[in-house]
Structure formats: C-alpha cells, structure tokens
Amino acid sequence: MDIKNLLNPIERPEVTSELTNNVVLTTLNDLYNWARLSSVWPLMYGTSCCFIEFAGLIGSRFDFDRFGLVPRASPRQADLIITAGTVTMKMAPALVTLYEQMPEPKYVIAMGACTITGGMFSTDSYTTVRGVDKLIPVDVYIPGCPPRPEAIFDAIVKLRKKMATEDVRDRYEQIRQTHRYHTTAHTLKAVPESLSSKYLESPTRQAPPPGLAAAMEMPLVLPEVVKQNEQV
C-alpha cells in the first residue's frame, strides 16, 4: 500500500490557468461587505426642502437604482437613514426611536445645512436641534442648502467605500462597548427683551427723517399725535 495515498487519499488538483479564471478567492468578510454595499436600503426622514432634491433621484435622469438603493417605509427593513431637513426638539425622540428600530449594522447620512448645524432656523429658534449628530451618530455629511443630487451620489459612493473596508467584528465590538449616540442639553442664554415700548422713545421714532414720508408716499403718524388721540 502506498503511504502517500494513505495519508492523502484525495489528490490536490493542479491550479491551471483555466481554473484561476473561473474561481474567485475572497474572504467571508469581503463577501459580506460587498453584499451590503450593493443593496443599501435607505429610510427617508425628510422634513424640509432637502427631501425634494432627494426625490429627484427617483426619476430616470439620475436613476439611483444602479446603486442598489431601495427605499423602505419601515425602519426594521432599512440599514441607512437619510435625515433631510430641520429637526426640532419635539421630533428628536421620534428620530431616535426610528434609529433604534433599525437592525445592525446601520448608517446615517445628514443631508443639508439644517440637519448638520440647524441652518438658518437655529439663529432665532429655541426648538431647533443644532446638528442631528447630537441625537444619532452620523457617518456622512452632505453640506448645502439644499445639496444637489450629484452631492447625494457622492455621499453614497463615500459610504460604500466605508462599508467595503469595514470589519464586521470590529463594528459590533464598538457598538457593544460604547453608546453610538448621545443627547446634549441645549442651554438658553438670557437676553434683554426686544419687544418693549422703549422703541417708541428712540430718536428716529420721535423725529423721523424728512425723506421718509416722501419715500413712503403717505403721511407719518408721529407719537405725539397718537398720545393726543388717546387722551381725547
């Protein structure tokens, strides 16, 4: 009896040129990442005008189906949430709930200036969240007011590159050890009241410029006349 056949009864096939052209050598991690980045299912959280730009991707001009994007109506079937528009304090718990209902691994794209920093609504509104990353972790930011559809495609490509280089074991370990989102309390600054009757005592109000009446093409009602009418 041949000892070589006894130790290895099945002969090792020779790797020929024909075999190398038909066999793909990869790892389970790369195969898993390729399947995920080729079938990204987004959940749209549109609250403002930025969502209109994303809706333009559905048409044939941009054709976002080529990236494997399939919009879902349920967070339990989505692995990507795109926040487009202003997020208020009252909407923050609903957004966090939707994010928590998504299965792991999950990703977030912040679209537009209002989502990233609060935008123009954060200057004089105490109910606007100054950045959605205070509520949920953001993977890709898309600046703009609103960003163009090409910018959304660029964000999708960058997210796909990030997904392709990830190790699933490291991501799950990171999720298990640390919290992926945090909430920051918004502090209000006390400012003097602007809506008061003191503005009537300003010099420009007491004595308006002469050319103001001509520009308005109507007579000006001076505070003295108002006081006289009130006394009568």
From Swiss-Prot:
Its cofactor is [4Fe-4S] cluster. This is NAD(P)H-quinone oxidoreductase subunit K 1. GO terms for cellular component: plasma membrane; respiratory chain complex I. SUPFAM superfamilies: HydA/Nqo6-like. [4Fe-4S] cluster binds at C49, C50, C114, C145. GO terms for biological process: aerobic respiration; electron transport coupled proton transport; photosynthesis, light reaction. The keyword Cell membrane applies. NDH-1 shuttles electrons from an unknown electron donor, via FMN and iron-sulfur (Fe-S) centers, to quinones in the respiratory and/or the photosynthetic chain. The immediate electron acceptor for the enzyme in this species is believed to be plastoquinone. Couples the redox reaction to proton translocation, and thus conserves the redox energy in a proton gradient. Cyanobacterial NDH-1 also plays a role in inorganic carbon-concentration. It holds the Pfam family Oxidored_q6. InterPro entries: NADH_UbQ_OxRdtase-like_20kDa (IPR006137), NADH_UQ_OxRdtase_20Kd_su (IPR006138). Binds 1 [4Fe-4S] cluster. It catalyses: a plastoquinone + NADH + (n+1) H(+)(in) = a plastoquinol + NAD(+) + n H(+)(out); a plastoquinone + NADPH + (n+1) H(+)(in) = a plastoquinol + NADP(+) + n H(+)(out). It is a peripheral membrane protein.
